[in-house]
Regions:
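Bacterial Sec-dependent N-terminal signal peptides
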Residues: 1-22
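Extracellular carbohydrate-recognition regions
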Residues: 19-43
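Extracellular beta-strand elements of beta-rich domains used
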Residues: 27, 211-215
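Short tryptophan-centered beta-strand motifs in secreted/extracellular beta-sheet-rich domains
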Residues: 27, 100-102, 158-178
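Secretory/extracellular carbohydrate-interaction modules
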Residues: 60-143
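Short strand-turn-strand beta-turns centered on an Asx-Gly dipeptide
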Residues: 179-184
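Flexible glycan-contacting loops in extracellular carbohydrate-active proteins
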Residues: 188-211
Length: 218
């Protein structure tokens, strides 16, 4: 009898693990095979270390450009704003309701420093993203390397200096909702999801540190 109960307990525990409704990535290891880029590329880096993931993109050095322009008398641009993303494949059925919750630290919000989420990621030219800076939030649909759809609205941050944030991406099967620190900042309808690719986006001289991300099947 005791043996039978033990077997039933083991089966029940196994079933509960198999059908777990959430998974939390704490970056103690690269368990979801994020696309790390540790070397200094033309666009930026994405490194997992010390229990967090840090994404850095490059930007124009405006101060040096102004100085060189003044010295030479010729308009001089130093560097360029770059887009950089890193992604994994989320343990979710994206055609069913889900929530993704993540805690991040942003270096700075500015008009030329953008950050956000990529999702429905098929490859480097085909994905959706929510991104924002200090004055606006955008939803973009990328197809074959081109932006083919944009929904944008202005946003007023209560505290532009607050760089520790909680982001949530929620899908109820019909509507996509992007939430920052408990406040809904953009809602998008009629954008079906097909792919489980999910990640983070930076543009310009931006640095984003990700503490954790939780995938929840609703």
């Amino acid at each position: 009898m005791k043996k039978t109960i033990g077997i039933m307990t083991l089966v029940l525990a196994t079933t509960m693990v198999t059908y777990a409704q959430s998974f939390k990535e704490t970056f103690d290891a690269n368990s979801l095979e994020w696309t790390e880029c540790a070397y200094e590329s033309n666009s930026g880096t994405a490194i997992i270390d010390g229990g967090k993931m840090t994404i850095i993109s490059k930007g124009e050095n405006k101060g040096l450009g102004i100085a060189l322009t003044a010295l030479s008398g010729v308009a001089t641009k130093v560097g360029a704003n770059t887009f950089f993303e890193t992604h994994c494949y989320a343990p979710l059925d994206v055609q069913k309701p889900f929530k993704i919750r993540t805690h991040v630290n942003i270096q700075k919000l500015a008009s030329d420093r953008t950050t956000g989420l990529v999702f429905n990621y098929k490859d480097g030219g085909n994905f959706y993203c929510f991104n924002f800076n200090n004055e606006m939030v955008r939803f973009e649909r990328h197809v074959d390397g081109a932006v083919v759809g944009v929904i944008q609205q202005g946003v007023i941050w209560k505290d532009k200096k607050k760089v520790d944030q909680e982001w949530e991406l929620i899908s109820d099967g019909q509507v996509l909702t992007f939430i920052v620190d408990g406040i809904q900042i953009l809602k998008v309808r009629y954008m079906p999801l097909e792919y489980t690719g999910f990640g983070y986006y930076t543009f310009g001289k931006q640095e984003l540190a990700v503490d954790d991300v939780e995938f929840i099947q609703l």
